[in-house]
Amino acid sequence: MGDKRDRYRIPRGVKKEALQGKDLRAMHGYGGGKVTKAINKKLRYQKDIGYKTAVSIDTYYRRHEKVDPPAKNFGDRKNPSKGYIMWKMMGGDSGHRWSRQLQKTLDVIQKKERLK
């Protein structure tokens, strides 16, 4: 199904939400550290990402999917939570759906690695 050299095409919706996240961060001055900003830049400017970035995105959503969306001001564009800005920077809801698809592919690759 793939290996660590594979590239994963970034969907248009992910790019759009990543741009919204960048704009929110610029407007409010908070949300997202160095890693989030680096991934956001890749999501906005590259047509695809590599294995390491795919793993980082999947890890982010696994860690944040249960805590960020129910938090206060999540989804509020005028006074957004830090979690909302980071969520958008990582591709938003489109990125979350995409990460679920990527997760299946990554799980297969990681399983193959363990069997070697």
What are these regions (language model features)?
Residues 1-116:
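Extended terminal accessory/targeting regions
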